[in-house]
């Protein structure tokens, strides 16, 4: 991840930043999802394939390079995957039922707490994807009530930020969240500012998972994007909801 000059009078030099939230948080979610989905696939519990895709070049000047390349491959029927063993898998006949984009999911807004956005693109299929995310959020929130009654969590408080990744965080209560479904035409949706817009423009049903985004906060596109601004209880909750959403989408009948 990179941030630009640290003040408005700078020369615009690109400075290396840790990118703890943007976008290691979502990358961590993909890695957590992989063994769960692989096990379900081996057991024959998935009705459709799930691709875990790490998209490169979202920021300017690349301008969603990875998302554009993927969409081009899908539209032109040239989708092929190159394996580590040199084998090529032809996926040109695949039809994508939907895409979930995760971008910045681990910073709990200090002014509007415990909210994340479920931002669908255009079309009824995208709204169905958002409905699955809404149901997954309700399932998670119901689970937190039960999990927090256990002796190991009963007397604990909210999670607290840690200054860096070298510290083991304290165990905290599971955090219930409010997932706001924000249509692409609404002012609260930030789909337009992500890879999700590329998929929507190409006619692919898409939903963005993102924190309650604040463009003016410290730690966004600057060198302060470190563990010091990460809320692990919040990020873990959004990640769990996202994984549950994908599982639901891969197992429920399509509309």
What does each model-found stretch correspond to?
Residues 14-138:
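Acidic/histidine-rich catalytic neighborhood of metal-dependent amide-processing enzymes
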Residues 7, 39-42, 254:
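Short, flexible helix-adjacent loops and helix caps
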Residues 2, 57-59, 213:
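Short, glycine/serine-rich, charged loops/turns that create anion-binding
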Residues 10-13, 222-223:
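Short glycine/proline-rich turn/loop motifs
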Residues 105-255:
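Active-site-adjacent substrate-binding region
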Residues 10, 80-81, 86-87, 179-187:
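Mixed-charge, polar/low-complexity N-terminal
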Residues 1-9:
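Acidic/His- and Gly-rich active-site-bordering loop/insert found
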């Amino acid at each position: 991840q990179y941030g630009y000059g640290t003040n408005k009078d700078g020369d615009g030099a690109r400075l290396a930043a840790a990118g703890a939230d943007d976008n290691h948080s979502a990358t961590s979610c993909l890695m957590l999802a992989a063994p769960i989905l692989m096990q379900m696939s081996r057991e024959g519990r998935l009705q459709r394939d799930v691709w875990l895709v790490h998209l490169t070049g979202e920021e300017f000047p690349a301008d969603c390079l990875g998302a554009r390349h993927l969409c081009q491959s899908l539209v032109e029927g040239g989708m092929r995957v190159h394996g580590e063993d040199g084998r090529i898998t032809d996926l040109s006949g695949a039809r994508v039922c939907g895409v979930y984009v995760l971008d910045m999911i681990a910073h709990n807004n200090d002014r509007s707490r415990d909210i994340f956005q479920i931002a669908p693109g255009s079309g009824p299929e995208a709204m169905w994807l958002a409905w699955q995310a809404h149901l997954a959020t309700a399932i998670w929130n119901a689970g937190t009530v039960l999990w927090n009654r256990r002796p190991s969590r009963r007397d604990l408080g909210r999670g607290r930020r840690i200054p860096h990744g070298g510290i083991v965080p304290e165990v905290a209560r599971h955090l219930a969240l409010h997932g706001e479904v924000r249509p692409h035409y609404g002012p609260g949706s930030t789909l337009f500012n992500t890879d999700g817009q590329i998929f929507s423009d190409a006619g692919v049903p898409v939903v963005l998972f993102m924190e309650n985004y604040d463009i003016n906060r410290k730690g966004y596109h600057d060198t302060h994007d470190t563990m010091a601004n990460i809320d692990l209880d919040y990020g873990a909750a959004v990640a769990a909801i996202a994984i549950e959403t994908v599982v639901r989408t891969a197992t429920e009948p399509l509309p």
